[in-house]
Every structure is written in structure tokens, then in C-alpha cells.
């Protein structure tokens, strides 16, 4: 148990105060303050062998000793009123006598609920348990779950997460004599005991509907981003100086590619929204996976503005307090937010079903979608870039209108850089894209795409060369290349496809080949940093980024700040009307569960023979690597989902 200077420790459940005495001596030359407490009356406590001497050591070292302190009611203790501690320590808890595991679980749960009332915001709770009691994989051997004290699950009830498990250092506290086994002076077996360290979890925050204003194809548009996507907006993972793993992976890839080719990344802003006309330029995109959007408002941008002015019009990025934010250079948006309930009348229809493709795209409002890929906007940027180069001629540098950043590297001549002395350039953009997919373990509703495009002489076999370079960079992390018609697919287990390399004949010369590389930076970050879950990438917990500030090189595994989170399974059954849109169901799951549902399985369906109704039964698996998730909290989310389904989709819960 390491303690920093000027720290305060609260010890609860002491018996003979031998641990308190050892700790007092250990930290006697530091500014650590120690308060030792026990449940018993003073007279009863003094009956323990050595208790009087140990209490004297604690007091002589400047510590305090309190009696009749119930560790399950610390908030009610008059002597602790107004005090907070950096560490709360409970060594080898036990209900006394021949207690069963259920009673001891209940003791732990009530202790955790109590201790958070006197714990500082960044404080720790230390619980020492005998080997096997905790019920975590750190126990050797590990008991069956139902026969353990389920310490992590009990802590989650108090919104605490298990952040570390390490051996109990009994040799460090030489005078410590454990007591209390079956309410006697007998001790527990502490030699192979484990110290469980718990910290506070961030609270769950409610979903918001974000109101966005941006310029799209010459129009000023306003629309709502669906509530279940609100956590993915305005995060700035790719901004300059970011140590987020998504940015680290992008830098790693670009640096590796820049050893063979020149790479130019654009810094131009592009909107989240696409029109159907733009989507039609990219036949590789599945329209059923698009988030279709209804506009709240559309205005024609004044013709008096120049094209440059139009771009500048949409560079403002506002947070919910109206402050400017330019974290993500690809977010050409103005964003404000409100609580879901306050804008439900406007936001309920913002997510159009993928089956609504029969709406006339040439109608008054047209069809818009959140960008499922950066490809349509890359086409536009490349066209604009070509026009600027052609128009520049002898007028000099056009960098003011065509912003890009050269990736550090060297132009390579020869077989890799180009052919016949010609060096090819890879033009790239990266940013957030959206996929309206059902909830699944590796189905990402939003992720960062890195898109690269280059034109090469066909005799150089550019797909093969790019594939070989990507293979060199990514094979050590479990990525393999699979040939397919027109290119390559990058595959990895267990997530599947993490990228593609596609080739097409360049429009200018038949002898040239246009090659496009599309990479899912989020899934690659999971692979390169050994993350247990892609949802960790979106954690607001500062401990996540602190890890990468110290360990920025791919290949160094991430050490989770939440260990062994429990899975919870709940079923939900309901009757629907004649129409049922499953995508809306999954959208509500993400919103109601705060993203904690990782799998949804259809268990059963039944169509009523006389009524136009169908019954569905689904099984939902709740699990979180970012927050404390207790059985109570998961059940609350599940009840919220039932309420959402009843009020928004008009289903009847069975």
C-alpha cells in the first residue's frame, strides 16, 4: 500500500490494531495522517491480545483511534463529519462467526456504499481478501462465481471500479496479526492474500441531441444529430498534438508510408452531412447503413459570397456554451446541444429509416445523410485541388486556398516511390464517419477513417506495393491481407475487416491506376494497443489518455483502469404493430444503455394469427470497460429501454 506525502488514511474494521500500529511506524517519517477505527466498544477492543500497546503506538505516531465506528455507516459517524480521506482500508473483512458468502457480500456492498461518503474525489479504497474470496481472475485458484464474495460487483454498486489487484504485502507489516476469524483472535491466511484497489468511476452522462449548422453544397443547413451519436461528436481525437491512440495510429501509418511515398494530408474542413447526389459517386457504400437526416432548416448561401467566403462561413465550431472549438480540423460545423427531452419533438424524426429510400431525392427537402465515408468529399477536394493547380499557372502559390500538411518523410525515387523516375504522391484526409449498424461487439456506429489516394503508373503494380507496405507495418499486430477483385482487404481477428485497398483506372490516362486506401483507425487502435474494447476509445476518463501520454508507441499493451467488469444479461419481449424498424430499436438501445450494451441477440418471434401483431424477444448483454456497471445500474438502463420503447416506438412490453 504505497502512500504519497500529505495523504490521509482511514482504517476500518480494526481488531487488535496491529495493522494500524505497523502502518503508523511505516509512515512515521511522512506527512501521512492515519485514523484507525473499530466496531467494538473500547473495553471489548482492549481484550484483544496486544491491542493496548498497538493503540499507544498509533497515538504516539500522531494518529487517531476511534471506537464504535460502523464501517457500513461512515457517513453517520460524528467523529468523521466533514472529513475526507485519500485512502480507506478494510483488511480481511468478515461478518463474524460462521457467515456465508451472501452475508459477506452484503457487508462489502454496504461498506463500499458507506466509504464513498468519506472518500476524496481521486481517492482509493483498499480491500484485503484471502486468496479465492474476491471472485476475480486474479485469484489462484479462482472460485466459482456464486461461491465468491464478488468484490468487484459489490464495489460497482457504489460506482467504484477495480483498478488494481496485487499481493498483500504481509512482510511489510511485520507486527500485523490478523484477527476476527469466526469472531476469535484467530487470523485469516494472509500469506497469499490479495489487495484490491478501487477508484471512483466517472458518472454516466445523459445523451443529448446536438443541433448542427453547416454549409453543404452551397446551402446553409440545420439538423439534429441523433442522440445515440452525441458522445462521438466534437471529441478532437485527430487534432494537432493529440495523444489519443487514434491519432497515434494515424501518425504511425503515415510515417511508415512516407518512407516510400510522399504523403500530403489536407487540413480543409468538410461537413458531416452528405447529399444523395454526393453518395452516388461512391458505389461501394451500402446505403442501408446510412444515418438519414431530416433538415430543420435550409437557406441558400448568398451569391455575393465568394467560394472562399463560403468555406470560411462554416469554420466555426461551437460547444453547448457557445465557445469556439477547433479541435477537429474536419468538423466544419456549428454545434449546440440541449437535453434530449427538451428537443424530443424536433429530434424524434431526425433518424430516417434505411428503408425510406423511396422518398424522391429531388423533392423540396432532398435526402441527406451523415457521411458514411470520406470518399465523396475526397473526390470533391481532389477536383478542387486540380482546378486550383490548373488556374494557378503563373500566378504563384495557391496554398492559401488549398491547405495541406506534408507528412515528415523523404520523396523516394525508384520502384517504390514511382516508376520511370516519377514519384507518386498520396493525398489523404481523415475524420469521423458514421454507420447505422445494429448493436454488436465489433459494429461501430462511428469511427475515424483514414483515406489515401494516389495515381500510379499501372506497370508499377501499386496495389501490390501499397499492400506490401501496409503488411509490413500491420502484420505484427495480427492484420493479414486478402486479395479480392479490384484490390485487397485488410483482415484481423476478432473484428474482421479493418481496411481496403482499391484500384481503378485513372480518368486522365489509361496507363495510370488510381489507388484508394481506406483504413478504420479505431479498430487498428484496438489492435495496435491491445485494447479490450473499442468503446474505450471514447472514454472521458482522464486515466485513458494519461496512459498514452506515457506509452505512445504501438505495441505497448494498454493497462485497463477498470479490471474484470461483469457482464449482465437481460431479456426483453414486446408486441409490435404491422411495421417494425429494427434500426430504431438498436438506436434506442444505445441511447438508453449509455452505450453499455455490447450484444443484442434475437431469441424468438411470434406472429399473432388473428391480429396484425408480432412478438419479439431479444437478449441484451450489458458490459462496460469505461464505467462502473452494477447489476442495479444495468437493470435501471434496461427499465429505461422499456420506457423508451413504449413511448417512442409504441410497442407493448410483455
Predicted features along the sequence, with ranges:
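Conserved class I S-adenosyl-L-methionine
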Residues: 4-24, 31-35
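A short SAM/SAH-binding and catalytic strip from SAM-dependent methyltransferases
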Residues: 75, 83-105
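A carboxyl-terminal module marker
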Residues: 476, 483-654
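Conserved beta-strand signature within the Rossmann-like core of class I S-adenosyl-L-methionine
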Residues: 121-129
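S-adenosyl-L-methionine
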Residues: 46-80
Amino acid at each position: 500500500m504505497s502512500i504519497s506525502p500529505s495523504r490521509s488514511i482511514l482504517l476500518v474494521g480494526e481488531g487488535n490494531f496491529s495493522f494500524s500500529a505497523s502502518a503508523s511506524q511505516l509512515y512515521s517519517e511522512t506527512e501521512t495522517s492515519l485514523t484507525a477505527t473499530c466496531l467494538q466498544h473500547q473495553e471489548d477492543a482492549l481484550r484483544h491480545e496486544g491491542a493496548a500497546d498497538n493503540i499507544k503506538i498509533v497515538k504516539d505516531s500522531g494518529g487517531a483511534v476511534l471506537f464504535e465506528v460502523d464501517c457500513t455507516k461512515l457517513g453517520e459517524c460524528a467523529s468523521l463529519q466533514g472529513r475526507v480521506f485519500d485512502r480507506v482500508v478494510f483488511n480481511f473483512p468478515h461478518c463474524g462467526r460462521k457467515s456465508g458468502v451472501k452475508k459477506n457480500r452484503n457487508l462489502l456492498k454496504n461498506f463500499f456504499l458507506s466509504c464513498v461518503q468519506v472518500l476524496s474525489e481521486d481517492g482509493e479504497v483498499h480491500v484485503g481478501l484471502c486468496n479465492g474470496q474476491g471472485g476475480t481472475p486474479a485469484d489462484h485458484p479462482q472460485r466459482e462465481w456464486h461461491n465468491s464474495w464478488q468484490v468487484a460487483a459489490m464495489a460497482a454498486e457504489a460506482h467504484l471500479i477495480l483498478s488494481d489487484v496485487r499481493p498483500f504485502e504481509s512482510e511489510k507489516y511485520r507486527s500485523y496479526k490478523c484477527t476476527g476469524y469466526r469472531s476469535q483472535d484467530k487470523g485469516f491466511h494472509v500469506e497469499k492474500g490479495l489487495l484490491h484497489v478501487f477508484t471512483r468511476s466517472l458518472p454516466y452522462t445523459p445523451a443529448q441531441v446536438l443541433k448542427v449548422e453547416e454549409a453543404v453544397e452551397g446551402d446553409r443547413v440545420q439538423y439534429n444529430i441523433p442522440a445515440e451519436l452525441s458522445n462521438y461528436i466534437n471529441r478532437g481525437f485527430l487534432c494537432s498534438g493529440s495523444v489519443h491512440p487514434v491519432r497515434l495510429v494515424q501518425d504511425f501509418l503515415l510515417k511508415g508510408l512516407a518512407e516510400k511515398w510522399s504523403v500530403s494530408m489536407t487540413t480543409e474542413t468538410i461537413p458531416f452531412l452528405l447529399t444523395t447526389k454526393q453518395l452516388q459517386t461512391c458505389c461501394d457504400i451500402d446505403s442501408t447503413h446510412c444515418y438519414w437526416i431530416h433538415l430543420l432548416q435550409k437557406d441558400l448561401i448568398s451569391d455575393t459570397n465568394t467560394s472562399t467566403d463560403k468555406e470560411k462561413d462554416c469554420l466555426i465550431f461551437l460547444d453547448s456554451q457557445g465557445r469556439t472549438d477547433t479541435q477537429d480540423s474536419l468538423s466544419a460545423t456549428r454545434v449546440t446541444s440541449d437535453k434530449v427531452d427538451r428537443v424530443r419533438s424536433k429530434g424524434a424524426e431526425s433518424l430516417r429509416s434505411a428503408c425510406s429510400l423511396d422518398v424522391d431525392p429531388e423533392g423540396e427537402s432532398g435526402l441527406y445523410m451523415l457521411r458514411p465515408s470520406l470518399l465523396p468529399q475526397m473526390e470533391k477536394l481532389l477536383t478542387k485541388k486540380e482546378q486550383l493547380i490548373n488556374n494557378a499557372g503563373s500566378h504563384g502559390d495557391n496554398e492559401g486556398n488549398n491547405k495541406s500538411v506534408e507528412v515528415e518523410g523523404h520523396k523516394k525515387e525508384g520502384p517504390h516511390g514511382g516508376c520511370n523516375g516519377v514519384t507518386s504522391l498520396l493525398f489523404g484526409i481523415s475524420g469521423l464517419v458514421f454507420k447505422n449498424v445494429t448493436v454488436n461487439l465489433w459494429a461501430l456506429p462511428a469511427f475515424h477513417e483514414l483515406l489515401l489516394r494516389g495515381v500510379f503508373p499501372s506497370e508499377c503494380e501499386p496495389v501490390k506495393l501499397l499492400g506490401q507496405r501496409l503488411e509490413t507495418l500491420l502484420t505484427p499486430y495480427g492484420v493479414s491481407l486478402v486479395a479480392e477483385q479490384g484490390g485487397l482487404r485488410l483482415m484481423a481477428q476478432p473484428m474482421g475487416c479493418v481496411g481496403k485497398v482499391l484500384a481503378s483506372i485513372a480518368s486522365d490516362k489509361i496507363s495510370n491506376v488510381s489507388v484508394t486506401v481506406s483504413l478504420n483507425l479505431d479498430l487498428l487502435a484496438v489492435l495496435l494497443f491491445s485494447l479490450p474494447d473499442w468503446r474505450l476509445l471514447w472514454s472521458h476518463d482522464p486515466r485513458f489518455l494519461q496512459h498514452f501520454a506515457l506509452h505512445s508507441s504501438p505495441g505497448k499493451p494498454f493497462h485497463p483502469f477498470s479490471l474484470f467488469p461483469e457482464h449482465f444479461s437481460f431479456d426483453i419481449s414486446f408486441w409490435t404493430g404491422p411495421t417494425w424498424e429494427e434500426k430504431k430499436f438498436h438506436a434506442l438501445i444505445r441511447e438508453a444503455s449509455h452505450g453499455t450494451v455490447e450484444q443484442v441477440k434475437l431469441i424468438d418471434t411470434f406472429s399473432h394469427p388473428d391480429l396484425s401483431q408480432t412478438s419479439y424477444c431479444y437478449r441484451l448483454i450489458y458490459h462496460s470497460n469505461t464505467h462502473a456497471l452494477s447489476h442495479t445500474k444495468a437493470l435501471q438502463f434496461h427499465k429505461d429501454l422499456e420506457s423508451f420503447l413504449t413511448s417512442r416506438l409504441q410497442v407493448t412490453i410483455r
